[in-house]
Amino acid sequence: MIDDGRPLFQQIAEQIEGSIIDGSLPEDGQVPSTNELAAFHRINPATAAKGLNQLVGEGILYKKRGIGMFVTVGARDALRFRRREAFARQYIEPLVMEADRLQISLDELKSRLDDRKADR
């Protein structure tokens, strides 16, 4: 899972975000500790801590002193919104621009998307 050119702490943060979005880390649920993440991924604990602290800074996680870090209530919806916006910028906008260049109508584009989704 941790293997691309992006910083490791960022990949840790994104994996935790994914677990929040898919529900495997519920809101108000405790997230794995820095040491657990470091041992699991075979990385430096400081790197794992940086990923967790990034999410604390974004309001996705909160700290309970002496206990650990937990998922903030509302984090799942906030992450879904943020990822949907990023998805639109990264995929939908270029798709629409290319469809315009090729004179593909919105109806045809929708039909092609429906076909692809049905094939899954």
Language model: regions and residue ranges:
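N-terminal helix-turn-helix
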Residues: 30-63
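Enrichment for repetitive, rod-forming helical segments
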Residues: 13, 57, 70-72, 91
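Short glycine- and Lys/Arg-enriched binding-loop motifs that mark or flank ligand-binding interfaces
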Residues: 19, 24-25, 47, 62-64
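Short alpha-helical linear motifs
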Residues: 54-58, 74, 108-109
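Extreme N-terminal segment that seeds HTH/winged-HTH DNA-binding domains in transcriptional regulators
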Residues: 1-31, 35-36, 80-82, 86-120
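Short, Lys/Arg-rich nucleic-acid/phosphate-binding segment
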Residues: 30-31, 63-76
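Gly/Ser/Thr-rich beta-alpha loop segments that engage phosphate groups in nucleotides
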Residues: 7, 53, 68-70
